[in-house]
Amino acid sequence: MDTQRLSLRKENGSAHSLLQDQTGLKENTMNIPRDSSFNSIFGPSEVVDDAGTDRDFKHESHKFSITRAMPEKLAGKNIAPFLAKHIPEQYAPLGSHAGEPVESSGANSRYCYRHRPDLKCRRQADEPTMDKLQRIAKELETLPQRDQQGIAHAWSIFSAAPAKHRKLLLQGIMAQCCFPQLSFISASVRDLIRIDFLTALPPEISFKILCYLDTTSLCKAAQVSRRWRALADDDVVWHRMCEQHIHRKCKKCGWGLPLLDRKRLRESKRQIELRAATWDISEQSTEDETGSPAPESASSNAKRKPESDDEDTALVKRHCTSIVPRLEKEKDGDYFITRYRPWKEVYKDRFKVGTNWKYGRCSVKVFKGHTNGIMCLQFEDNILATGSYDATIKIWDTETGEELRTLRGHESGIRCLQFDDTKLISGSMDRSLKVWNWRTGECISTYTGHRGGVIGLHFDATILASASVDKTVKIWNFEDKSTCLLRGHTDWVNAVRVDTNSRTVFSASDDCTIRLWDLDTKTCIRTFHGHVGQVQQVIPLPREFEFEDHDAECENDNVSVTSGDSPAASPRGIPGLDAGTSETQSSPFGPAFDNGRPAPPRYIVTSALDSTIRLWETSTGRCLRTFFGHLEGVWALAADTLRIVSGAEDRMVKIWDPRTGKCERTFTGHSGPVTCIGLGDSRFATGSEDCEVRMYGFQS
């Protein structure tokens, strides 16, 4: 037998002696076809034909032998069982022979990431991989036929081996490698161990991972591959991103983006109602499908309260398009196809607007037409309403700048107004309030009852509150036609704000105080002291606004909060606790709020003629922050969850960060004191005694 065989005993078995003896061995001719050696590069399941020469690995108790060359017939007998055992679907297609024990292949049925059949079927070789395979094939062709067959044979054995055997083979190979070879392995493995984990993981886990990324990282992830782009651009990921940033400041990055267009919100709700009327989707309410649009609107002198809690939470409740594909396939025709905007597009649109706010990039429109100072304004969608000391109200088209109509009827200057889809209510120094159909210019009704001029009003649902020079606040109930008078201020009442959710009213007065009233008991439940000038505006912040306690910096030495009509401060400075009241009282607003009644808005913002703006916490009565920057008294104020906008006697308009107190930007342009401000998500408008209205647009 012309085959050479080397045997080493395990007690003396050192790799060193093995290497020395291997140098004298001769290769035997292997009759493996050339195409078989080439094909073995591309598939781990390719194996050598049974007729080919093979190597026999035998483990004995104290010795092992390595066969370098043997007859083809003997090699086939030794290797074929090994191949049939580990890849039976190719070498034993009809099953095992009768009487042969069948070992469990459980350990061999678990695939690693690179060899998972489902991934291998989907995986496409990229250009670097194809180039590498072609280089290996060309390099293999340069070798002698005998060497090609030997290398291909070694690859086939390794490919057919299970994980445990492969590990042993690799350990033996690396134990015999020199440093240049180990360095080559290290450099090659560095790229090979990089796995496409997003493709390997279930989509739910991939979405969870991507939700931790910021917008820049998400955009970079979308450039990796088509699969990554599909995952990174999915509505599940960007809906979460919008939840974190739109209409609120993100706690991680500090960015906050404005809400969406209220007009688009209403259109989307109408589409949903039409679809709901056409086929039954009883499990989904229309409030849960408010769509991608959300409000971007204005206020008169201050940020108006959202029309409903559903609209305010529409952003969170909107279903993602990827979650409700059923709606797109239920009916034929474009009429029944959902028209949701992708959340990434929504975020992109809002991000552009937020960036314009941050850097002051805006367009300016000037509205001229009044003949006396403008004292109040409000805008909604493309409608702007302004009231002036010339006793007129003008309705404007904000898109074209055209004056649509003029409402006449008051006998004196108009100090306040507010409108919705159906009506406009105005207050005048002639002591009356008028209700108008602003679309036609018709005066529907006139309300009288104050003994002085009406200089402030606010309505919400069926409740109207008016503030007057006669030092009182009057409540008008449109539903039951009842009225009541709230007395307590000792000077002009300049502003009022109704919160129907908690059934409370805030008022600001020239007596330098702010009061909180209970509409159920018709009593004052809180008085805030702190300003040293006449308080002109009070704005409750939206309930989504969050303020970190450690950001509070206002000194409370000159601030006092009283409960009820008592002029004394509450014990320990805790509002809602009179001198004889126990601290165990559950609600800081009194026993009327103990039975599940919603509490008033947690934060309010006020401005006064002492040139300052203050941020208050209503539950504790603390002044959390004082904003300094205006040179003269602050007449106008507007606020939302992202910013505060103020206008003052110094003819300047300032934008503030309510959390830090920093003045982010100052706008000039008016030639008279700024008397009123309307704030939207993508724009704001200012009115002045110079008879002009200036609208600043930050749209993308």
UniProtKB/Swiss-Prot annotation:
Q: Where is this region: Disordered?
A: 282-313, 556-598
Pfam families according to UniProt: F-box-like, WD40
Q: How does it assemble?
A: Component of the SCF(sconB) E3 ubiquitin ligase complex.
- Say which family it is in: Belongs to the WD repeat MET30/SCONB/SCON-2 family.
User: What is the name attached to this protein's record?
Assistant: Probable E3 ubiquitin ligase complex SCF subunit sconB
Gene behind this chain? sconB
Q: Name one GO biological process term.
A: protein ubiquitination
Query: Any idea what job this protein has?
Result: Component of the SCF(sconB) E3 ubiquitin ligase complex involved in the regulation of sulfur metabolite repression, probably by mediating the inactivation or degradation of the metR transcription factor.
What does UniProt list as this organism's lineage?
A: Eukaryota, Fungi, Dikarya, Ascomycota, Pezizomycotina
User: Which superkingdom does the taxonomy of this entry point to?
Assistant: Eukaryota
WD-type repeats, residues? 369-406, 409-448, 450-486, 488-529, 583-626, 627-666, 669-700
Q: Domain F-box spans what residues? A: 195-241
Q: Which CDD domains match?
A: F-box_SpPof1-like, WD40
Q: Which organism is it from?
A: Aspergillus clavatus (strain ATCC 1007 / CBS 513.65 / DSM 816 / NCTC 3887 / NRRL 1 / QM 1276 / 107)
Q: Which UniProt keywords apply?
A: Repeat, Transcription, Transcription regulation, Ubl conjugation pathway, WD repeat
Pathway per the UniProt entry = Protein modification; protein ubiquitination
